């Protein structure tokens, strides 16, 4: 668009001058410019929109001597087009006509009333109902990062201060913001490159004093001590920029944003980006949502419940008091699931409706849904009243009753309101006397027109005469062409059609003016009454938000009760003793997709048994066994029941996974480099209370390098860090670790080989595996028989060269699989270069001492 911008607008028409001035205020984003029933785009905006939305690009005359590229969309379909643009990461400024065309001498007055961006949308047509839509801001200084997130559709405002790059990367993956604000001098661009909705902001928006002032103004406070964020300067810098951006885009007050909460690492189990990805919590490795933990666990009946459950899954809490309360609630609700869920389903997405109420963008159907949600509360209270559980009763109290608001909306809004207030017919009859009077006048038109038609037919004797109305010409009397010559003299021709003539008479014109006036006044009054409803509802916003949060939590807990009953989960026991003891544990996702019974397995990790070396064939179930342990721990720490017969679990501060890897081509990192980076992160950050899953360390390099790295990593985790570790490997040398270190044990997953076939038992047994079964798995995968045959020959050759290769000790001298020559010692090299015939007796004696020192 810049190519067409003329800073001197005088060459343009008045309408284009107005457009260009508005566009100059929003140069980086699309401007939807309201003209009658359409939003128009001009110049480069039109070209861009035609490509993004697949709409026609036309021209609108000329301005300053140049044809103007133009594209347009009908105003009634704007939400569909906005959704397409937002999904592509675009932002749009909505410019409306605010002046009256009838009284405007020049172009109608217009102004930008809101800016729609990916992170600040609240309209249900633009949002995914079962996912949070977050706006985030990131700040960095020499001490670490500041990070703030806001869900404008709920008012949930959070900040944190990640100490290092890995923690910041994990936060970005956990929150997955739709839009991310960053300072113009942000140094770690590699951390955020490739993320959607990046917005570069000026440095002054991140100033700490401005941030404190903005936040205190928003919350109506003198300081931020009460929120526990007073000293979080880096987080506040990010939060201040974020709040300013929201105010700039929304152009309205934000009463639903009432507090800010600090998220501290010590409050939750920390999972890095690789762990979240590998455990497939809400997204599978292919980027979809099928066969994830959330897909199995989420049978919530409200969108706000679904979003809360996903937040719980990504932020397991370490406070066992909270977890035991959740367990108690789940147990107490199991008998009432079938009664509660149908009622909860009717509550809908109250959380987001309240956000639109706060932004004053709620539509008539939003208020109807709010009324419907209020109508469910008495039934929910009645059902929960009999549940003898203190946490359940606390939830019931937070839900509230809102009988007065329910009564207000039942009186004010009709049962099935139209989409928009401007369509009319939103306010119920009987709510307002004056409105009823204007409506009666407007609605009486049909009876009057029927009477007028009968009277005029009788008076004129014209049987083709009829009275009608259209939006262009208003009311008219129509007579067929064949009888039009008989029209009375007081009939004034208004319109000529092919087969008829249309007339107006003074009486009809007078009535038309009266009816149209009444319709306009009724609509204006209806809009006024609708706005007054907001004023009556908004003082209760804080209580309503608390109720929505309680209803969402109830939905999550009822859902977990249903899942526990349906999927045969058990309630885990928390203990202060380190370790995890699982009896007949199952993988929550794999057991749902199998067509055969899942083989349950035990697990025992304790201070005396901190590391399990897991061996067995490929496809034998090692990765499944490891992941199910992490998922059982994760479920326990959101308060859920777990897929096992019995679980006792101690303190866990972090979960790490080094499971599988792929090339990171975008960053120029090989599979091995990715693997080593993840391994380094674990070795630097794991503690004795961490759960660590290590799968096939050292595969991407030579046998010696890989084995040495795997051995050293296992040694470090077992001896120095003392983390609870599951260490799967194909290096059979590692099965000797239990003989050399305390707290290490061998387990294996077995298989049976019969001829060319192999049967995986998927059962975990104590001790090391007897062999790898690699060739049998290759045959099962369809590798050609001649290749398998040749591989067997080569295997026999290698085994004959180095019969003890699999059993040699790693900390002693290990023979090469390909019998490479040993490294020559310095003493041997010196002897080979020595000429004994040239030595004197004294020199020979000196050489003996020298060789002695070299050995």
Curated annotation (Swiss-Prot):
ATP binds at residues 616-623. SUPFAM superfamilies: DNA repair protein MutS, domain I, DNA repair protein MutS, domain II, DNA repair protein MutS, domain III, P-loop containing nucleoside triphosphate hydrolases. This protein is involved in the repair of mismatches in DNA. It is possible that it carries out the mismatch recognition step. This protein has a weak ATPase activity. One of its GO terms (molecular function) is mismatched DNA binding. GO terms for cellular component: cytosol. InterPro entries: DNA_mismatch_repair_MutS, DNA_mismatch_repair_MutS-lik_N, DNA_mismatch_repair_MutS/MSH, DNA_mismatch_repair_MutS_C, DNA_mismatch_repair_MutS_clamp, DNA_mismatch_repair_MutS_core, DNA_mismatch_repair_MutS_N, DNA_mismatch_repair_MutS_sf. The gene is mutS. The keyword DNA repair applies. It comes from the Bacteria. It comes from Salmonella paratyphi A (strain ATCC 9150 / SARB42). Belongs to the DNA mismatch repair MutS family. This is DNA mismatch repair protein MutS. Keywords: ATP-binding, DNA damage, DNA repair, DNA-binding, Nucleotide-binding. GO terms for biological process: mismatch repair.
